[in-house]
UniProtKB/Swiss-Prot annotation:
Primary residence: membrane
This protein's record includes keyword Plastid: no
MF (Gene Ontology): transmembrane transporter activity
HAMAP family recorded: MFS_MdtG
Protein name in UniProt: Multidrug resistance protein MdtG
Subcellular location: Cell inner membrane
Membrane topology note: Multi-pass membrane protein
Transmembrane segments: 19-39, 56-76, 90-110, 113-133, 144-164, 171-191, 222-242, 254-274, 288-308, 317-337, 376-396
PROSITE patterns: MFS (PS50850)
Length: 404
């Protein structure tokens, strides 16, 4: 029996990749609460300079990730997904270690760019599970996997803040590097993949990748949907604390209240993603996607009219429950409309669109709030999501008509 014929326990791989995504999500978000403080510690002074450099070191990671993702996706299709998971976990661990040793802001900026270049654990984990899970269970599998990164991202800021308070800023980077190295070890020892390497000559070029897709227009619309999801999430991030302060008035625990309101969508997504993924396997991810987008619009609009922080928290919890269905539904549809041969590149292209959304969303939110106020951000974001719902529905309708 050849190595490629050995059966794979995809559920065990799902468990290990879930842990890897959890650790990666936690590692990335561990340093987020004090990123501006670390920038200040590296010698940046003045309000405007601090804002500029904090924005740069935050966004440059996503920018370089968007550039590098297609390259790593192509390499994953040639060499296998496990080796890309190992490369990503070890590379990020080394970069995080070096970040804790940075002596000036330029070194830190370069290392943040390197983090984006060497990242990609989560999209490669998605590609691995997408190619191993049975098609009729891919919605549940990808929905479950998505909760790993969400769980880590929820716990990371809390743990990072506590660690920074007790041990200082630099040690948190060393702890984060250790967490990523554990992720590397878990992947090395426990993930199994049957993959026959493909020579560079046998690799499909971009034009051939597009030609091999069952419905290229639909796949493009799914990429755009991923971008819009991140734009919608990111547009609210820069103004959330300030909006909560406006709603709450003069209260002493504004940081706690805004932190709780920031985290409730993640908790809701954690609860809803596997269940809605399983429902998508039964009724079709297309229906889940469109309904979740419409519900998101209906929840975003009243957010601009709330009068108390608790009204906002309730709406954001419901929004998180709907959002928990979106990315897994997109990923399941990508699985349905591509082959295992190109899965790495398709998921990496999707990651690039996600990273672009991560960069543009906060910029859009900040620009709208500066010109028209906080409440306008929710209305404009609702309009963007509504456009995406119509665009996605039209793309899915065209595919259905083409099949008929």
């Amino acid at each position: 029996m050849s190595p490629s014929d050995v059966p794979i326990n995809w559920k065990r791989n799902l468990t290990v990749t879930w842990l890897g995504c959890f650790l990666t999500g936690a590692a990335f978000s561990l340093v987020m609460p004090f990123l501006p403080l670390y920038v200040e510690q590296l010698g940046v002074t003045g309000h405007s300079a601090l804002n500029m450099w904090s924005g740069l070191v935050f966004s440059i990671t996503f920018l370089f990730s968007a550039i590098a993702s297609p390259f790593w996706g192509g390499l994953a299709d040639r060499k296998g997904r496990k080796i890309m998971l190992l490369r990503s976990a070890l590379g990020m661990a080394i970069v995080m270690l070096l970040m804790g040793m940075a002596q000036n802001i330029w070194q830190f900026l370069i290392l943040r760019a390197l983090l984006g270049l060497l990242g990609g654990f989560i999209p490669n984990a998605n590609a691995l599970i997408a190619t191993q899970a049975p098609r009729h269970k891919s919605g549940w599998a990808l929905g479950t996997l998505s909760t790993g990164g969400v769980s880590g991202a929820l716990l990371g800021p809390l743990a990072g803040g506590l660690l920074a308070d007790h041990y200082g800023l630099r040690p948190v980077f060393f702890i984060t590097a250790s967490v990523l190295f554990i992720c590397f070890l878990l992947t090395f020892f426990f993930i199994r993949e049957n993959f026959l390497p493909v020579s560079k000559k046998e690799m499909l070029h971009v034009r051939e990748v597009v030609a091999s897709l069952k419905n290229p227009r639909l796949v493009l619309s799914l990429f755009v949907t991923t971008l819009i999801i991140q734009v919608a999430t990111g547009s609210i991030a820069p103004i959330l604390t300030l909006y909560v302060r406006e709603l709450a008035g003069n209260v002493s625990n504004i940081a706690f209240i805004s932190g709780m309101i920031a985290s409730v969508p993640g908790v809701a997504a954690l609860l809803s993603a596997p269940r809605l993924g399983k429902l998508g396997d039964r009724i079709g991810p297309e229906k889940i996607l469109i309904v979740a987008l419409i519900i998101s619009v209906l929840l975003l609009i009243p957010m601009s009219f709330v009068q108390t922080p608790w009204q906002l928290a309730l709406l954001r919890f419901l929004l998180g429950a709907a959002d928990g269905a979106l990315l897994p539904a997109v990923q399941t549809l990508l699985v349905y409309n591509s082959t295992n041969q190109i899965a790495g590149r398709i998921f990496s292209y999707n990651q690039s669109f996600r990273d672009i959304g991560n960069v543009t969303g906060p910029l859009m939110g900040a620009a709208i709030s500066a010109s028209y106020g906080f409440r306008a951000v929710f209305c404009v974001t609702a309009g963007v999501v509504l456009f995406n719902a119509i665009y996605s529905w039209n793309s899915l309708r065209r595919r259905r008509l083409a099949i008929e």
